[in-house]
């Protein structure tokens, strides 16, 4: 009987009330979608938005990306005021564009401009998947083509960070046309001996992966990035085969010779610096007048 008096009580975890949960401001904590670890957002930002537990690369917005690779204060933006219209009068498209402008503080899904990496001048374009899933419409294509032409004029390398769901369906054939336009601009840059570095981040799919994203002299990618044209389910239904678990990942593409390297975000700036150093003088072997 005495033994019954000293039975250990079961331990219960205290579940915070809804009011306590509400007292935690939004954005203070971030949950990793891969390992489910919850961490302070400010610590995640200090680590370039890479999970300290599992190494998952969280998406970066355009400005975070530029800050991580360019010399401080060196960036000068191109074509900032360029915005998309609704040439096909697609229902609801203008409202969606306006909502994304307010949400992201961007006018379109790509930011272009020039800056330096270890004092070496480059022209850079960074796609931002928060704006229409980084889809490529007429303005995205035009901004990228103009940036490539600027690199050609300045005789400096062109670097792009891609993150896109592909061509923008609301612009129909006008969006598909950007695949050819950007590719032609890059061909001109290449013919003159210009250096082009493409860095594919998660996700790079559809018409973007099938055009300028895959045309680099160096094709790099971040770990775990989804890279491909059609979706996994569509391919499986077409070929009637089960695809490997790592199909369309950066690591799978590297193993099959479609990438030059998979580069951790911590090492990205230094990797770019080394490539640029090898191609000093802008990588321009022979310039055509």
From Swiss-Prot:
Which reaction(s) are listed as its catalytic activity?
Answer: N(6)-carboxybiotinyl-L-lysyl-[protein] + acetyl-CoA = N(6)-biotinyl-L-lysyl-[protein] + malonyl-CoA
* Annotated S-S bridges: none
* Pathway assigned in UniProt: Lipid metabolism; malonyl-CoA biosynthesis; malonyl-CoA from acetyl-CoA: step 1/1
Question: Cellular component terms, GO, for this chain's entry?
Answer: acetyl-CoA carboxylase complex
Membrane-crossing residues? none
The residue ranges of the CoA carboxyltransferase N-terminal domain are 28-289
Report C4-type zinc finger ranges.
32-54
Q: Name one Pfam family in it.
A: Carboxyl_trans
**Which Enzyme Commission number(s) are on file for it?**
2.1.3.15
- Known InterPro entries for this protein? AcCoA_carboxyl_beta, Acetyl_CoA_COase_Trfase_b_su, ClpP/crotonase-like_dom_sf, COA_CT_N, Znf-ACC
Needs which cofactor? Answer: Zn(2+)
This protein's major location comes to cytoplasm
**Amino-acid positions noted as binding Zn(2+) in the UniProt annotation, renumbered to this chain:** 32, 35, 51, 54
Location comes to: Cytoplasm
Supply the alphabetized keyword list.
ATP-binding, Cytoplasm, Fatty acid biosynthesis, Fatty acid metabolism, Lipid biosynthesis, Lipid metabolism, Metal-binding, Nucleotide-binding, Transferase, Zinc, Zinc-finger
Which GO molecular-function terms appear in the entry? acetyl-CoA carboxylase activity; ATP binding; carboxyl- or carbamoyltransferase activity; zinc ion binding
Top-level EC class, please?
A: transferase
The record's comment on cofactor binding reads: Binds 1 zinc ion per subunit.
Gene Ontology biological process terms, A to Z? fatty acid biosynthetic process; malonyl-CoA biosynthetic process
This protein's assembly is summarised as:
Acetyl-CoA carboxylase is a heterohexamer composed of biotin carboxyl carrier protein (AccB), biotin carboxylase (AccC) and two subunits each of ACCase subunit alpha (AccA) and ACCase subunit beta (AccD).
- Into which family does the record put it? Belongs to the AccD/PCCB family.
Function, as annotated, reads: Component of the acetyl coenzyme A carboxylase (ACC) complex. Biotin carboxylase (BC) catalyzes the carboxylation of biotin on its carrier protein (BCCP) and then the CO(2) group is transferred by the transcarboxylase to acetyl-CoA to form malonyl-CoA.
Q: What is this protein called?
A: Acetyl-coenzyme A carboxylase carboxyl transferase subunit beta
| Annotated source species | Bacillus mycoides (strain KBAB4) (Bacillus weihenstephanensis)
Q: Its encoding gene is what?
A: accD
């Amino acid at each position: 009987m005495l033994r019954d008096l000293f039975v250990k009580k079961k331990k219960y975890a205290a579940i915070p009330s809804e009011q306590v949960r509400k007292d935690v401001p939004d954005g203070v904590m971030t949950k990793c979608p891969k390992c489910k670890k919850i961490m302070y957002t400010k610590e995640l930002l200090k680590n370039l938005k890479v999970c300290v537990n599992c190494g998952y690369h969280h998406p970066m917005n355009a400005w975070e990306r530029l800050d991580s690779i360019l010399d401080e204060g060196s960036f000068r933006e191109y074509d900032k005021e360029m915005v998309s219209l609704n040439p096909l009068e697609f229902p609801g498209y203008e409202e969606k564009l306006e909502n994304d402008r307010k949400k992201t503080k961007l006018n379109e899904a790509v930011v272009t401009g020039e800056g330096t990496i270890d004092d070496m001048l480059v022209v850079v374009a960074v796609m931002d998947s928060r704006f229409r899933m980084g889809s490529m419409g007429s303005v995205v294509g035009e901004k990228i083509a103009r940036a490539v032409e600027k690199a050609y004029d300045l005789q400096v390398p062109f670097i792009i960070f891609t993150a896109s769901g592909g061509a923008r369906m609301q612009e129909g054939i006008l969006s598909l046309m950007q695949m050819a336009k950007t590719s032609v601009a890059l061909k001109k840059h290449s013919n003159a001996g210009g250096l082009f570095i493409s860095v594919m981040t998660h996700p790079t799919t559809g018409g973007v992966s099938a055009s300028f994203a895959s045309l680099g002299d160096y094709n790099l990618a971040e770990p775990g990035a989804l890279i491909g044209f059609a979706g996994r389910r569509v391919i499986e239904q077409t070929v009637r085969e089960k695809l490997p678990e790592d199909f369309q990942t950066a690591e799978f593409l590297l193993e099959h010779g479609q990438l030059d390297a998979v580069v951790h975000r911590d090492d990205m700036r230094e990797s770019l610096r080394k490539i640029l150093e090898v191609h000093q003088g802008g990588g321009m072997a022979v310039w055509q007048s």
